[in-house]
């Protein structure tokens, strides 16, 4: 993609997420309230139960985390709640406003002292990333369901690598090309209609992307088939659709590994050996 086209696309993407921040409708209470914030988080982790396991929020207590594409801040809050020092950024200013209000509300609760452990940035990660407030770079760069929405994900990953400690971890989620969602259904219940850019990757393509950015891939796992009946889901009711309601759980979990929509990628910035 040419530079001029990339700039236009970035502006289009920014406008899209400003007008409909991701997951903002996960809550039924008035947007911005504490009740709404709790509803958003509960629904997010209910329908994507693999996310907290993948992020392993408690693992990063006292560690420095860079979150690329924080959206409305659900995972940001979870990292903070478990003691991480978080720099969170997003292209969407409207999304960041919600993240700021949520961290402000939760930051009132002792003993977390969140205000001293959170920084928010309205930036395009292709162009600029913050430096760690501490020394030596970030312990974790985390991005869940974001990089497939940017024109140049390789550039973002290379930028991120330059801000990380040697041996630090990268944990990202990318959409899978060969999934139940893409092969057998036109409905995208968790995604938002009209998204201007949403790439999908094979396992090999995802591995190649991460390795081209200078990381060593440790694991790539496929997961997540959306089992809920859409007409109930949009009304915040959770009724499983056919065939998911009749499948034994072990069979469903096996299918997720084969036809899941989410590629969960763990990698590290290699330690550079000196002569």
Spans of features found by a protein language model:
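Conserved class I S-adenosyl-L-methionine
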Residues: 2-61, 74, 169-193
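Conserved catalytic loop of SAM-dependent methyltransferase domains
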Residues: 31-38, 212-243
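Class I SAM-dependent methyltransferase SAM/SAH-binding core
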Residues: 64-68, 72-128
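A conserved beta-strand element that flanks and buttresses the S-adenosyl-L-methionine
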Residues: 142
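A short glycine-rich, Lys/Arg-flanked "PGG" loop and its adjoining helix->strand segment in the class I
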Residues: 154-169
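Acceptor-substrate binding/catalytic loop of class I
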Residues: 188-205
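Core SAM-dependent methyltransferase catalytic element
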Residues: 254-275
């Amino acid at each position: 993609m040419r530079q001029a086209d990339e700039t236009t696309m970035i502006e289009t993407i920014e406008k899209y997420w400003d007008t409909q921040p991701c997951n903002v409708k996960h809550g039924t209470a008035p947007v911005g309230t504490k009740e709404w914030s709790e509803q958003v988080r509960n629904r997010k982790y209910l329908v994507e139960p693999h996310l907290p396991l993948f992020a392993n929020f408690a693992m990063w207590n006292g560690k420095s985390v860079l979150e690329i594409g924080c959206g409305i801040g659900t995972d940001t809050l979870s990292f903070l709640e478990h003691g991480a020092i978080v720099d969170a950024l997003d292209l969407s200013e409207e999304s960041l406003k919600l993240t700021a209000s949520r961290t402000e509300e939760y930051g009132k609760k002792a003993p977390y002292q969140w205000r001293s452990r959170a920084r928010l940035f309205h930036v395009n990660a292709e162009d600029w990333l913050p430096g760690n407030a501490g020394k030596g770079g970030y312990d974790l760069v985390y991005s869940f369901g974001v990089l497939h929405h940017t024109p140049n994900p390789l550039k973002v990953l290379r930028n991120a690598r330059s801000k990380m400690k040697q041996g630090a971890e990268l944990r990202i989620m990318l959409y899978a090309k060969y999934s139940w969602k893409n092969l057998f259904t036109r409905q995208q219940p968790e995604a938002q209609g009209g998204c201007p850019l949403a790439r999908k990757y094979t396992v090999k393509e995802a591995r190649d992307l991460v390795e081209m950015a200078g990381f060593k891939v440790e694991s790539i796992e496929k997961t997540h088939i959306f089992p809920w009946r859409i007409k109930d889901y949009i009304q915040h009711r959770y009724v499983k659709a056919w065939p998911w309601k009749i499948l034994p759980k072990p069979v469903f979990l096996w299918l997720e590994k084969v036809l899941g929509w989410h590629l969960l990628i763990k990698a590290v910035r290699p330690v550079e050996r000196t002569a």
